[in-house]
C-alpha cells in the first residue's frame, strides 16, 4: 500500500521537476515551484505517522519516470489489482497505517484494516512498477468520469422533471449518516462513484480520519494527494513551502484517488504540490485536528464528481496524474455547462462545504488569481477557508451536521442544524444552516476536516467561487466571515440542479432520519427559479436554527425544497402539534384543526341592542361555547404552519390577529346576556366593531365633542369589514382582569313614541311576542289574545315596561356576568327596589370599595348630564349604563348604546326626570339614574368596610 502512494508522490516531484526543466513557469494559479530535482526532501513528523518522529527521505525526482503507457481496463478490475497488491508493496503487512474501526465500512466486503507500522519507502523499481499500474487505473477512471460527466449534462436537462437515482450508499454502516447529495446527480455518475467507493480503506494519520473524499481537494480544486497514498500509508509529498511537523500534510491531502478521480494532467503545471501548503494546518495544530467524520464515510462517492467538476474550472495545467482531477474530462464539459453548475450538482451535500473553489490551477472566468478569503480553523491556524467577500449568508440554508468520530453521537444533534439547501449555496456548495455555521472540533485530535470531510479548508486563489471551508467537529459555531462571499458568478443551472435534500437509498440514512425525527420534502429537489426567490423572501420570517430544540424527536425548522411553490413555514405551536409536523413540513395540507372564527355574538364590551325586541330575545347559543383562549391561541398558531391551501399573506394576518383573539375570547362571553347576536366583531388595538347605525354614529360624533366624552366609549369612525360597515370604538373591558359586568337599561320606556304610533297604524299580530308574554306571565294575555295566540307590538311593548323596574324605578337590569363566567338574565320580573338592591349586592359581593366607586362614578355622570348640551336636546331611549369591576377593585360605569337616541326639534329640550306622557317625549333617564345613585349610596353605607 505504501508503495503506491510513494510512487505517486515521486511522480508529483518528478513532474514538477520536468516542468521546471521545460520552462513551464508558474501556472495561472500562482503556484510555487516544487522542490528542485535531485534534491532529497525531508518531511519530518509527517502527519501520516504522528508521534513517530520518523523522517522520510525522498529520492531524486528523476529517479522515477511518470511516462508509462496507459493501458485501458475496467476501473473495477484495476482497483482490485490495487487493493489485492496493497499489502505486499512494502514487503511487510504491518507497513500500512492502521485504520479506525469504522474506516472503509462503505465497502464492508472489501474492508482492510492493517496494523500500524514503520513506513519505509521501497526501491525505485518497485515504485515504477506500481506507478504503471496506477497510471492505467487513472486512465480508466478518466474515461469513466468523462462518460459520467457527459451523462450528467444530459441528466441535468431532465432532472427538473424526474428525480435522479440516489448514490450507492446502501452499504454504509458508519454510525454517522450519509451526507446529502445533489438531487440532480445523474445515475451515470452514481455508477462511477460506486465503483470508486472501494478505494476508501484506511486513514492516513493516527487519529481517526474519515474516509475522506476528493471533495475537499475537488472543492479546493487544487491537486491533492491521492487518497490511495493515504491508504497505503505513504508519507506525503512535500509541496512548495511544504509545512513541517504536523502541518506537513493536512487532511485536505485526501483526494481524488480516494474518490477514484485521477486526472490525466498535462505536465508542466507547477500547481501539483499546492495542496500540501493549502491543505495543511499550520505547525502545532495537529492537536486541534478534527477527526474525519464518519458522517461522510458512507457517501464519499459524491466527492469524485465534485472534484472532477471543480477542477475543470480554470485554464490550469494539472501536473500529476494522481494529484489532479482529469482536467481533460472536466475541460471537455466546460463547453457544456459552467463550472459552478458542475460544482453545484456534485458539491451539494450536507456539510460538504470544503473550500469549494474551482480548480486552483488558474483564475476562473477572468477573475484574479489572488481572490480568496482567509479563514481561520478552529484551532486558530490560518486556513484559507473563508468565503469570498460578497457571498450572501441569507441564502445559506444547508445545515451543517455536527460530526463525530464515535458511534455515540449518532444523529442526536442533527435536527437543530439541519435545513434545506438554499438557492445560492446549493449552487456553490457553501454550507449553511439558516445562518452562518462553522463546524469546529471540540473532541479528540484529528485534522480539521473540510465540510465534515477531512481536509483543511482553503480558498483557492483565482476562484471566484471560494467557499468557506468548515472544519468539522461536534460544535456548530457562527462563522462571521460568511458575510464575505458575495461575488460568486453562479451560472443559471437547470432547475433540477437545485439541491433537494434527498436521503437517497442508504439504510443508514433512512434509519437516522427516523431516529432524529427529521422532516424531509421527499421531492426531486426540483425548484423553479421563482420558487427560490420566494423562499429567500420568506426566509426572513424563519428563526435561526440555533433557536431550535435539540430534541431529535422534534421536527426542526427548515425551508421546504419541494416542487410546491407554497413557502413552507413552520411556527412552533408550543409543542402541541408535533405529531403532524412531519407531514406539514412535507407540504401535505392539514385538514384538521381549522381556525374557529370568533363568534360575532360574543363580541362587544360596549353595549347591547337598543331595540326593544332584541333585548327580549333569548340567547341562541351558550355563551360558554366560545373558544378557550389558550386553545384559540394554539389554533391560531397552528394555522401558521405551511398549508398548500393557505397563502403567506393569510398566515401573517393570523399572526396579527392572534393576540387579540386570546384576550377577546377571554372577556366576551357575557355580551350575549342582552341578545346581541351578530352585532359585534373583534378589532385590533383594544377596539371593537359594532354594526353601523346612522343614528348612533351621529350621536357618537357629537358626544366626542361634548362634556360627556369621558363617560362614553371613544369613537374612531366607521370601517368596512367583510363587506359590512361598522362603528369602531374602544373596548371598555381592556383594562380589567376577569371583569364582572352589569347592563342596566335606562329610562321609563325603552321604545320610541314613533314606534308606538307606527305600530298602532298597522297593527300586526305577533305570535313570537305572545309566546314571550306567556313565558313571563301566563295570565298577562287577554282572552282575545289567548284565542288568537298573538299580540300586537304596541301591546307587548307597553306590557313589557310594566312587569319590570323600568316603570317603577326608571331602569331595569338586563343581565349580569360574574368573574367566573356565569351569566344571569333572569331579571324580567325584577321590579321592586329590594329586588334590585339584592341583585346589586350579589353583583358586587357587598364590596365596599366597589360600591363607593360605582356611586361616585354615577354621581359624576349625573352632574355632567345636567350640563350637557347633547343630553338636553336628545331623547335618550334604549341607552344603557355598563357597570364593570374586577378583583382588583377597579370599578367604572359608562353610557353606551345610542342607537335609539333621537335629536329633538330645534329649540326643544327635555328634563329627563318627569313622567312620560305620550307626546312629551320624556324618557325618564335622570329618574332612573337618581334611583341608581340612591340604591348604591345606601348599599355603600350598609356594607362593611374592607
Swiss-Prot record:
- Alphabetical keyword list: ATP-binding, Calmodulin-binding, Cytoplasm, Cytoskeleton, Endoplasmic reticulum, Kinase, Nucleotide-binding, Phosphoprotein, Transferase
What interactions and quaternary structure are annotated? Interacts with DMTN.
Which reaction(s) does the protein catalyse, per the Swiss-Prot or TrEMBL entry?
Answer: 1D-myo-inositol 1,4,5-trisphosphate + ATP = 1D-myo-inositol 1,3,4,5-tetrakisphosphate + ADP + H(+)
Which residues are listed for substrate binding in this entry? 745, 766, 793-800, 900
Which GO terms fall under molecular function for this chain's record?
Answer: ATP binding; calmodulin binding; inositol hexakisphosphate kinase activity; inositol-1,4,5-trisphosphate 3-kinase activity
Keyword Kinase part of the UniProt annotation = yes
> What positions belong to coiled-coil segments?
none
GO CC annotation, single: cytoskeleton
| Renumbered residue ranges of the record's region Calmodulin-binding | 768-776
The entry sums up its family as follows: Belongs to the inositol phosphokinase (IPK) family.
Chain positions with Phosphoserine modification: 43, 49, 71, 204, 269
**Biased composition range(s): Polar residues:** 396-411, 524-534
GO process terms (BP): cell surface receptor signaling pathway; cellular response to calcium ion; common myeloid progenitor cell proliferation; inositol phosphate biosynthetic process; inositol trisphosphate metabolic process; MAPK cascade; myeloid cell homeostasis; negative regulation of myeloid cell differentiation
Report the top EC class in one word. transferase
Please name the InterPro entries in this protein's record: IPK, IPK_sf
Describe what happens upon changing residue 897 to N.
Loss of kinase activity
Activity modulation comment: IP3K is activated by calcium and calmodulin. Form B is much more sensitive to calcium/calmodulin than form A.
Name any one Pfam family assigned in the record. IPK
Enzyme nomenclature, EC number: 2.7.1.127
Span list, region Disordered: 19-128, 156-288, 308-472, 486-561, 580-638
Q: Which Gene3D superfamilies match?
A: Inositol polyphosphate kinase (3.30.470.160)
Q: What is this protein called?
A: Inositol-trisphosphate 3-kinase B
Compositionally biased region (Low complexity): 83-105, 445-458, 599-612
Protein localization: Cytoplasm, Cytoskeleton; Cytoplasm; Endoplasmic reticulum
**Task of the protein:** Catalyzes the phosphorylation of 1D-myo-inositol 1,4,5-trisphosphate (InsP3) into 1D-myo-inositol 1,3,4,5-tetrakisphosphate and participates to the regulation of calcium homeostasis.
Which gene name belongs to this protein? Answer: ITPKB
Amino acid at each position: 500500500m505504501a508503495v503506491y502512494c510513494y510512487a505517486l508522490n515521486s511522480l508529483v516531484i518528478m513532474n514538477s521537476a520536468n516542468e521546471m526543466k521545460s520552462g513551464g513557469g508558474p501556472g495561472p494559479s500562482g503556484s510555487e515551484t516544487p522542490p528542485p530535482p535531485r534534491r532529497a526532501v525531508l518531511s519530518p513528523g509527517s502527519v501520516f505517522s504522528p508521534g513517530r518522529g520518523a523522517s522520510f527521505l525522498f529520492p531524486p525526482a528523476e529517479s522515477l519516470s511518470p511516462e508509462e503507457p496507459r493501458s485501458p481496463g475496467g476501473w473495477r478490475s484495476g482497483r482490485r489489482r490495487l487493493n489485492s497488491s496493497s499489502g505486499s508493496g512494502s514487503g511487510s503487512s504491518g507497513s500500512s497505517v492502521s485504520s479506525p474501526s469504522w474506516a472503509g465500512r462503505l465497502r464492508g466486503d472489501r474492508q482492510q484494516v492493517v496494523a500500524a507500522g514503520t513506513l519505509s519507502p521501497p526501491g525505485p523499481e518497485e515504485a515504477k512498477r506500481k506507478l504503471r499500474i496506477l497510471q492505467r487505473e487513472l486512465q480508466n477512471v478518466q474515461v469513466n468520469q468523462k462518460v459520467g460527466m457527459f451523462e450528467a449534462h444530459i441528466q441535468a436537462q431532465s432532472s427538473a422533471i424526474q428525480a435522479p437515482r440516489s448514490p450507492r450508499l446502501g452499504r454504509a454502516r458508519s454510525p454517522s449518516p450519509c451526507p446529502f447529495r445533489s438531487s440532480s446527480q445523474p445515475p451515470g455518475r452514481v455508477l462511477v462513484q460506486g465503483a470508486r467507493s472501494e478505494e476508501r480503506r484506511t486513514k492516513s494519520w493516527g487519529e481517526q480520519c474519515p474516509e475522506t473524499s476528493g471533495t475537499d481537494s475537488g472543492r479546493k480544486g487544487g491537486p491533492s494527494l491521492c487518497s490511495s497514498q493515504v491508504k497505503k500509508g505513504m508519507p506525503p509529498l512535500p509541496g512548495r513551502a511544504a509545512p513541517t511537523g504536523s502541518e506537513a500534510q493536512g487532511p485536505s491531502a485526501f483526494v481524488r484517488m480516494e474518490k477514484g478521480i485521477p486526472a490525466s494532467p498535462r505536465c508542466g503545471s507547477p500547481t501539483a504540490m499546492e495542496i500540501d501548503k493549502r491543505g495543511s494546518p499550520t505547525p502545532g495544530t495537529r492537536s486541534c485536528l478534527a477527526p474525519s467524520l464518519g458522517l461522510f464515510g458512507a457517501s464519499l462517492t459524491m466527492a469524485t464528481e465534485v472534484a472532477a467538476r471543480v477542477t475543470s474550472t480554470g485554464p490550469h495545467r494539472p501536473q500529476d496524474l494522481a494529484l489532479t482531477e482529469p482536467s481533460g474530462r472536466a475541460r471537455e464539459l466546460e463547453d457544456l455547462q459552467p463550472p459552478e453548475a458542475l460544482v453545484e450538482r456534485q458539491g451539494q451535500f450536507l456539510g460538504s462545504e470544503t473550500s469549494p473553489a474551482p480548480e486552483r490551477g488558474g483564475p476562473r472566468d477572468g477573475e484574479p488569481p489572488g481572490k480568496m478569503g482567509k479563514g481561520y480553523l478552529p484551532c486558530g491556524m490560518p486556513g484559507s477557508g473563508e468565503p469570498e467577500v460578497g457571498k450572501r449568508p441569507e441564502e445559506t440554508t444547508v445545515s451543517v451536521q455536527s460530526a463525530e468520530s464515535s458511534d455515540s453521537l449518532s444523529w442526536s444533534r442533527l435536527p437543530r442544524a439541519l435545513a434545506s439547501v438554499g438557492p445560492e449555496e446549493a449552487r456553490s456548495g457553501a454550507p449553511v444552516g439558516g445562518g452562518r455555521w462553522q463546524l469546529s472540533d471540540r473532541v479528540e485530535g484529528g485534522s480539521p476536516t473540510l465540510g465534515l470531510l477531512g481536509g483543511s479548508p482553503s480558498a483557492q486563489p483565482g476562484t471566484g467561487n471560494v467557499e468557506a471551508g468548515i472544519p468539522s467537529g461536534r460544535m456548530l459555531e457562527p462563522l462571521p466571515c460568511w458575510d464575505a462571499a458575495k461575488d460568486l458568478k453562479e451560472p443559471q443551472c437547470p432547475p433540477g440542479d437545485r439541491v433537494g435534500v434527498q436521503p437517497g437509498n442508504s439504510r443508514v440514512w433512512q434509519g437516522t432520519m427516523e431516529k432524529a425525527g427529521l422532516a424531509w420534502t421527499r421531492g426531486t429537489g426540483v425548484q423553479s427559479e421563482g420558487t427560490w426567490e420566494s423562499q429567500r423572501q420568506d426566509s426572513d420570517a424563519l428563526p435561526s436554527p440555533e433557536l431550535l430544540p435539540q430534541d431529535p424527536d422534534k421536527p426542526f425548522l427548515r425551508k421546504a425544497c419541494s416542487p410546491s411553490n407554497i413557502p413552507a413555514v413552520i411556527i412552533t405551536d408550543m409543542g402541541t402539534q408535533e405529531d403532524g409536523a412531519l407531514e406539514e413540513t412535507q407540504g401535505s395540507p392539514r385538514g384538521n384543526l381549522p381556525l374557529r372564527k370568533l363568534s360575532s355574538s360574543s363580541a362587544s364590551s360596549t353595549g347591547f341592542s337598543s331595540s326593544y325586541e332584541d333585548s327580549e330575545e333569548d340567547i341562541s347559543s351558550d355563551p360558554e361555547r366560545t373558544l378557550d383562549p389558550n386553545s384559540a391561541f394554539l389554533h391560531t398558531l397552528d394555522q401558521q404552519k405551511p398549508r398548500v391551501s393557505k397563502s403567506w399573506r393569510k398566515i401573517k394576518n393570523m399572526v396579527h390577529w392572534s393576540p387579540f383573539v386570546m384576550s377577546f375570547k377571554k372577556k366576551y362571553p357575557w355580551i350575549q346576556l342582552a341578545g346581541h347576536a351578530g352585532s359585534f366583531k373583534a378589532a385590533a388595538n383594544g377596539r371593537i366593531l359594532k354594526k353601523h347605525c346612522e343614528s348612533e354614529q351621529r350621536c357618537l360624533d357629537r358626544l366626542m365633542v361634548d362634556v360627556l366624552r369621558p363617560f362614553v366609549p371613544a369613537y374612531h369612525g366607521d370601517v368596512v369589514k367583510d363587506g359590512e360597515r361598522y362603528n369602531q370604538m374602544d373596548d371598555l373591558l381592556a383594562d380589567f382582569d376577569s371583569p364582572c359586568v352589569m347592563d342596566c337599561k335606562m329610562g321609563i320606556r325603552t321604545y320610541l313614541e314613533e314606534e308606538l304610533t307606527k305600530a298602532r297604524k298597522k297593527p300586526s299580530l305577533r305570535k313570537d311576542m305572545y309566546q314571550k308574554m306567556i313565558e313571563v306571565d301566563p295570565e298577562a294575555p287577554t282572552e282575545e289574545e289567548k284565542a288568537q295566540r298573538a299580540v300586537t307590538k304596541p301591546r307587548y311593548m307597553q306590557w313589557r315596561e310594566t312587569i319590570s323596574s323600568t316603570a317603577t324605578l326608571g331602569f331595569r337590569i338586563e343581565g349580569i356576568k360574574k368573574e367566573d363566567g356565569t351569566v344571569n338574565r333572569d331579571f324580567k320580573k325584577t321590579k321592586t327596589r329590594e329586588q334590585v338592591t339584592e341583585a346589586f349586592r350579589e353583583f358586587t359581593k357587598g364590596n365596599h370599595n366597589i360600591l363607593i366607586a360605582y356611586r361616585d362614578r354615577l354621581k359624576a355622570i349625573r352632574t355632567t348630564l345636567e350640563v350637557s348640551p347633547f343630553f338636553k336636546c336628545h331623547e335618550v331611549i334604549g341607552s344603557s349604563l355598563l357597570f364593570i369591576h374586577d378583583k382588583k377593585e377597579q370599578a367604572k360605569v359608562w353610557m353606551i348604546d345610542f342607537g335609539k337616541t333621537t335629536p329633538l326639534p330645534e329649540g326643544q329640550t327635555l328634563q329627563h326626570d318627569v313622567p312620560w306622557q305620550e307626546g312629551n317625549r320624556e324618557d325618564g333617564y335622570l329618574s332612573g339614574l337618581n334611583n341608581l345613585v340612591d340604591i348604591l349610596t345606601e348599599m355603600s353605607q350598609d356594607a362593611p368596610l374592607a
